[in-house]
Amino acid sequence: MAVRKLWKTVVQLFSKSKSEECNTEAGTMEVSCLKYGVQGLNADCSYVKSQCIKLSECECLYTFASDVCKEDFHNSEEMKVFVVQHSQEIVGGTDFSVHAEESV
């Protein structure tokens, strides 16, 4: 459950992009994670990256997806640490814990 909540928060951060295509791809990644868990992202990785790499607005989402796909998370705590570190880099130091608490 914690992983789903964290991923949803990350997707929400990226979905602020003005690009409709990028928002759609963020949704695709969210659905994949909710259905199959963190490991399920691996199945969708090539598709998501192939779509996002075409969009300059989607660069940070593409980078994050690439990083997530390289990781092999054994539990939600590992996922949390990784997501927090990377989301702060990507969104310029946004307090991720605040966003996570607001997300339901």
Curated annotation (Swiss-Prot):
Keywords: Host membrane, Membrane, Transmembrane, Transmembrane helix. It is a single-pass membrane protein. It is found in: Host membrane. One of its GO terms (cellular component) is membrane. The chain crosses the membrane at residues 37-54. It comes from the Viruses. This is Protein U9.
